[in-house]
Amino acid sequence: MVEWTDEERTIINDIFSTLDYEEIGRKSLCRCLIVYPWTQRYFGAFGNLYNAETIMANPLIAAHGTKILHGLDRALKNMDDIKNTYAELSLLHSDKLHVDPDNFRLLADCLTVVIAAKMGPAFTVDTQVAVQKFLSVVVSALGRQYH
């Protein structure tokens, strides 16, 4: 089980309570698909992903990015039991969607970059430690059901 300090809980909740999920979700997923183009293979049904401009303008990508950020709300509300909170989602991604679990880490890294860019100098070392710890636990939970 992960141990959270009061400071980490506060940092994480403060950050996510101020995020515009539509903006941050879209930017994070778009960044992942552009920087790591092999991740696009899971989004074939989302239409044209020909280049960065089409990815950034794709409403299905934007909507899925928002959905991902809202999915993190479950982890925020269950910080002491993230692994069990994401058990079904892990099964979906492993058994039905066959997503390479390393892609969760890539997306988490992109989300960290987008949050840091949004926060600017307020994204301190302590903030980064808390955000990366939180996202690492989420990534671990999503990869838990893989064989």
Swiss-Prot record:
GO terms for biological process: hydrogen peroxide catabolic process. Pfam families: Globin (PF00042). Red blood cells. The keyword Transport applies. Residues 3-147 form the Globin domain. GO terms for molecular function: haptoglobin binding; heme binding; metal ion binding; organic acid binding; oxygen binding; oxygen carrier activity; peroxidase activity. Heme b binds at residues 64, 93. The keyword Iron applies. Keywords: Heme, Iron, Metal-binding, Oxygen transport, Transport. InterPro entries: Globin, Globin-like_sf, Globin/Proto, Hemoglobin_b, Hemoglobin_oxygen_transport. SUPFAM superfamilies: Globin-like. GO terms for cellular component: blood microparticle; haptoglobin-hemoglobin complex; hemoglobin complex. Hb 2 is a heterotetramer of two alpha-2 and two beta-2 chains. Hb 3 is a heterotetramer of two alpha-1 and two beta-2 chains. Involved in oxygen transport from gills to the various peripheral tissues. Belongs to the globin family. Hb 3 displays a Bohr effect, which is enhanced by organophosphates, and a Root effect, which is enhanced by ATP. This is Hemoglobin subunit beta-2. The gene is hbb2.
